[in-house]
């Protein structure tokens, strides 16, 4: 298996000047440590109906939830990317991590590439490179095209593996000479949970009482989507390594969101529950990527609702990442739940995990305190 290493995305509340006179400066970090900023297409670009772009699931989700904002304009990066790159230079950043809007680049499933969308990303990447900013590119950041959701339910259908691979092929071919770091999927675990268990992010599917989802099945869909994400990643990784890696010299990986879990007491039950939380939240994606299969704990608890890798699929997923991207914000203590995991009724991801999470510091759906110290336990 190819060596896998962690690429850690760290969010800083202040900028470093590049000098070593400050109490805390770049000089406190090893040579080669990369300081950068990060965003995604829907959070940054705006221009949602310009130059041939078609809606993504984020557009439909935001405009069908009246109490939500939307990304119609947002930072207006589509028009102001040169100003933003100048800010990066002024802030002394080394890198910019952004995502490509699939529905801007390919507005129809197997139709032609949108030349205006293509030119935007070429211009952005060239602007970054011209100013010494390394582009880190994500292919999917929660925003597959709405036309795929309408046609075959998007990530719930294995058909998306082929379409995602075709989309990635365009990106590698058109941008790969200047892009050395590719992430196929951003936070695969969170996309699966938020979009298909909780219903609080696109495409907004769930079956949890009180969540007001129109469609969905929280007992099965998160696991199906997670499975297809991994298969799509493996397919795209294989394409890159076979056709592009030697010529372009880049790396390709997959990212997850991690939480620093620790037991709330010294009891054996809480220690076991903490391991179970790690297996469900982190091992769900990491297990297949590193070992070729899901954690035994998940397979035992989820049972027949858990998709199964064929021997060939297992070998394709195992070792398919040159790196694992870690997005880290939070820490939580874990208490074993006295409730038995649901085997009937309406099980979901959290009832399967069957723990009580208590987040450290302030936490709400809209804001929370970052816990950088917990990343040591994650690693």
Swiss-Prot record:
SUPFAM superfamilies: (Trans)glycosidases (SSF51445)
Disulfide bond positions: 206-213
Entry's EC annotation: 3.2.1.21
GO molecular function: beta-glucosidase activity
This protein's UniProt keywords: Disulfide bond, Glycoprotein, Glycosidase, Hydrolase, Signal
Binding-site residues, a beta-D-glucoside: 43, 141, 186-187, 329
UniProt catalytic activity: Hydrolysis of terminal, non-reducing beta-D-glucosyl residues with release of beta-D-glucose
Domain of life: Eukaryota
A biological-process GO annotation: carbohydrate metabolic process
Extent of the signal sequence: 1-20
Active site residues according to the UniProt entry: 187 (proton donor)
Pfam families: Glyco_hydro_1
Protein name: Putative beta-glucosidase 6
Biological source species: Arabidopsis thaliana (Mouse-ear cress)
Gene designation: BGLU6
